[in-house]
Structures are given as C-alpha cells and as structure tokens.
Curated annotation (Swiss-Prot):
Superkingdom of the source species: Archaea
Organism field: Archaeoglobus fulgidus (strain ATCC 49558 / DSM 4304 / JCM 9628 / NBRC 100126 / VC-16)
Any one Gene Ontology BP term: regulation of DNA-templated transcription
InterPro entries the UniProt entry points to: Arc_rbn_hlx_hlx
Protein name (Swiss-Prot/TrEMBL): Uncharacterized protein AF_0613
Organism ancestry: Archaea, Methanobacteriati, Methanobacteriota, Archaeoglobi, Archaeoglobales
Length: 105
C-alpha cells in the first residue's frame, strides 16, 4: 500500500471532507476509501476512451483513429476507398439487428 501527499484547493478539500463524512462518517480510513473509489472510477473512464479503429489493406495498417469519423477523414486524405479496407475495432461492437413486422395503429 502506497502513501501519497497531495495539495488541493480549500474548496475541493471541504467538499471531499463533506462527502467522506456523509458516506462513511468518521471511521478510520474513510477518506482513503473515498479517494481510492474516485480514482478507480476515473481510471475506468480513461480506459473506455481508448477505443481504437484500425483500417487494414491486406496485412498492411493503412490508418488508425479513435472514432469512425476521424478514420474516414484520414482515409479520404490518403485517397483510400473505405470499401477497399478492413476496419477493425479494439472493442467488440454489438450489431444492431431489427427483425419482424412493424405494427402501427
């Protein structure tokens, strides 16, 4: 277990102490628990932003971007037809499938 010394503004410190008191009371290690929980949430948010799309032509990496619009822009700049490359995502993308009749009254 590591120890960190940080400097934060008075306003943030007051809000932090209020949250700790509200959530855990004055128990030992309460502030550490709240800060650790907040950092875990922050790290998970950062991890979600790391989605990457890559365009391959055969085995060659043609372009790489963080979203499909950016990837399309890069492919246009390189004069590469998007239909001529294989686009792969670093995360699984759930396909949208709709089947059946649409009922309207």
């Amino acid at each position: 277990m590591g120890t960190l010394t940080i400097s934060i503004s008075d306003d943030v410190e007051k809000r932090l102490r209020d949250v700790v008191k509200e959530k855990h009371g004055s128990s030992k290690g309460a502030m550490s628990k709240v800060i650790e929980e907040a950092l875990k949430i922050y790290f998970s948010i950062l991890e979600k932003k790391k989605k990457v799309f890559r365009a391959y032509r055969g085995e060659e990496l043609v372009a790489e971007a963080h979203d499909l619009e950016e990837l399309a822009k890069i492919l246009r700049e390189k004069n590469v037809d998007p239909r001529s490359v294989k686009i792969v995502s670093s995360e699984h993308i759930k396909p949208v499938a709709r089947m059946g009749w649409k009922y309207v009254r």
